[in-house]
Amino acid sequence: MAKVSLFKQDGSQAGEVTLNDSVFGIEPNESVVFDVVISQRASLRQGTHAHKNRSAVSGGGKKPWRQKGTGRARQGSTRSPQWRGGGTVFGPNPRSYAYKLPQKVRQLALKSVYSTKVTDGKLIAVDTLDFAAPKTAEFAKVISALSIERKVLVVLPNEGNEFAELSARNLENVKVTTANSASVLDIVSADKLLVVQSALTQIEEVLA
């Protein structure tokens, strides 16, 4: 069973946490992680790109010249695609790029990235993150006490940590999520994970 050090908010060590090997100790599947990251990045795309075809371009309702007798090629509109200022053919239309992967694939990717963080020593467990009020300075002290210098993903329990979330919201390189909402993309994008002990239990309940 994998073990990680458990810290208090002030940075002092409070003991160790034993992790479930079926969640935090598997052989990472990099191919599955790649597929899930691509899927989640695709879901973030707005997909609002658009073009104007010949029917959407303003003007062009009048036939530019009569059908026969001019010696020119027949034309029905000055907004045909071959005209300057005409419509676009086969241009982009608004669409959703999102696509879903099977649940087992997504769960395997989560277990893979969690296991990688544990193996690399980049998962920091903290017994609790309790704040009497939303204070950015107080959360900054926690980050400093735990010697976290680069981008960190803070994983809170699913409920009851509103002050912690508000306290971290304005800190640079700090992103906050919950046990059920942590995504593979968020985890691989962060240098370290700061996970509350109760959130670890909730993660194991879902993925084990």
From Swiss-Prot:
Belongs to the universal ribosomal protein uL4 family. One of its GO terms (biological process) is translation. HAMAP family: Ribosomal_uL4_B. Part of the 50S ribosomal subunit. One of the primary rRNA binding proteins, this protein initially binds near the 5'-end of the 23S rRNA. It is important during the early stages of 50S assembly. It makes multiple contacts with different domains of the 23S rRNA in the assembled 50S subunit and ribosome. Forms part of the polypeptide exit tunnel. Residues 45-89 are annotated as: Disordered. Keywords: Ribonucleoprotein, Ribosomal protein, RNA-binding, rRNA-binding. This is Large ribosomal subunit protein uL4. Gene3D superfamilies: 3.40.1370.10. The keyword Methyltransferase does not apply. It holds the Pfam family Ribosomal_L4. It comes from Lactococcus lactis subsp. cremoris (strain MG1363). One of its GO terms (molecular function) is rRNA binding. GO terms for cellular component: ribonucleoprotein complex; ribosome.
